[in-house]
């Protein structure tokens, strides 16, 4: 498990402590030092690179003020703040900075404002024609968890399989900047996990191992000698792969409702009657009311439901299996430890 180096920690600390306006100016200067063509407005920044992939992240957080206290549990490799961390989406900003600073790779870059207020920056940018001369797909770095990839209205199975080949698993998602930009520009897009959990709450955490892992995976995508083209296909329930996998394989769709088989008893139930939960394989499964008690547990730490492993019964989900977070030092003391 690799932790943060001193300079990496300092970069993250600075990102967490900046307001959106200051971050916009800082990112504009940063991109101008790396790219020839950069456009900065009050709503977004973009830079035109030489790799036909765009990396996307948003500069705002849900919290009214930046953090003043920041803690890093070295043993568990997790960051948090009692003021609300704001890793959604400062973790995505950090990931892009690290990719540009540690390599000569120059993908297109998009930084947006006010994603948490409904994607205001992305909506303004979406009104323009795509500014990139070549753009094969977009990667947003703005997803909770460790290995999720979310596709929103993009419904190209070949694209899903390609992204999953780098070690991600398709999951559900409701909204992000690419859910606006992708359809507007007719470009395949995915949102990848950057390690934060419990976003939009004061117990938000950032798993550094997961963040660094995603950074390395994205580098591999950018380093491909041949980057494939993918046709943008609009989402529909009749063709969406997760619909086929989760409903047609485990149940049947009726004329007016979804019907799903309970994983345990195999009974057929309306989608409104069953309980969805992340299974042991990381994918969503369903249990009926009669089978919930024996097969689903609620984590004593985070409160989220998880499927019970009969061979390893426990009261804590896999994501929290390391135990509760512990603060071992102040940020000042931590910096000294990292410098050793």
Q: Predicted regions: what is each one?
A:
Residues 4-51:
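A non-catalytic alpha/beta surface segment that caps or lines the substrate-entry region
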Residues 45-87:
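Catalytic-core environment of secreted peptidases
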Residues 53, 169-214:
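Zn-dependent metallopeptidase/amidohydrolase metal-coordination segment
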Residues 62, 83-163, 170-172:
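Acidic/histidine-rich catalytic neighborhood of metal-dependent amide-processing enzymes
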Residues 198-256:
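His/Asp/Glu-rich mid-to-C-terminal helical/loop segments that flank catalytic regions of hydrolases
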Residues 262-265, 288, 299-302, 317-320:
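Short cysteine-rich clusters marking metal-coordination/redox-active sites
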Residues 267-270, 287, 295, 306, ...:
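Cys/His-rich microdomains that often coordinate metals
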Residues 280-293, 312-323:
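Cysteine-rich micro-motifs
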């Amino acid at each position: 498990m690799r932790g943060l180096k001193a300079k990496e920690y300092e970069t993250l600390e600075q990102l967490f402590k900046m307001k959106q306006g200051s971050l916009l100016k800082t990112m504009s200067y940063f991109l101008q030092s790396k790219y020839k063509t950069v456009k900065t407005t009050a709503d977004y920044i973009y830079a035109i690179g030489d790799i036909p992939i765009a990396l996307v992240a948003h500069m705002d957080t849900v919290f009214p003020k930046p953090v003043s206290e920041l803690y890093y549990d070295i043993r568990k490799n997790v960051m948090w703040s009692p003021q609300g961390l704001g890793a959604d989406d400062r973790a995505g900003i950090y990931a892009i900075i690290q990719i540009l600073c540690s390599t000569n790779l120059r993908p297109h870059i998009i930084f947006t404002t006010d994603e948490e207020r409904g994607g205001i920056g992305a909506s303004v940018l979406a009104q323009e024609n795509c500014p990139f001369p070549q753009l094969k797909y977009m990667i947003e770095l703005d997803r909770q968890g460790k290995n999720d990839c979310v596709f929103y209205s993009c419904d190209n199975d070949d694209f899903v399989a390609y992204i999953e080949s780098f070690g991600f698993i398709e999951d559900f998602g409701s909204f992000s900047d690419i859910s606006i930009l992708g359809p507007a520009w007719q470009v395949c897009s995915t949102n990848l996990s950057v390690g934060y959990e419990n976003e939009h709450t004061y117990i938000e955490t950032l798993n550094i191992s997961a963040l660094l892992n995603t950074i390395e995976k994205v580098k591999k995508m950018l380093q491909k000698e041949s980057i494939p083209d993918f046709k943008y296909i609009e989402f529909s329930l009749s063709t969406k792969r997760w619909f086929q996998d989760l409903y047609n394989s485990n149940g049947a769709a009726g004329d007016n409702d979804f019907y799903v088989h309970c994983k345990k008893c195999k009974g057929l139930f309306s989608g409104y009657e069953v309980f969805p939960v992340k299974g042991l394989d990381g994918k969503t499964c369903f249990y009926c009311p009669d089978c919930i008690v024996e097969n689903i547990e609620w984590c004593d730490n985070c409160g989220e439901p998880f499927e019970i492993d009969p061979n390893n019964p426990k009261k804590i989900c896999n994501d929290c299996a390391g135990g509760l977070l512990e603060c071992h030092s102040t940020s000042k003391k931590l910096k000294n430890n990292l410098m050793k």
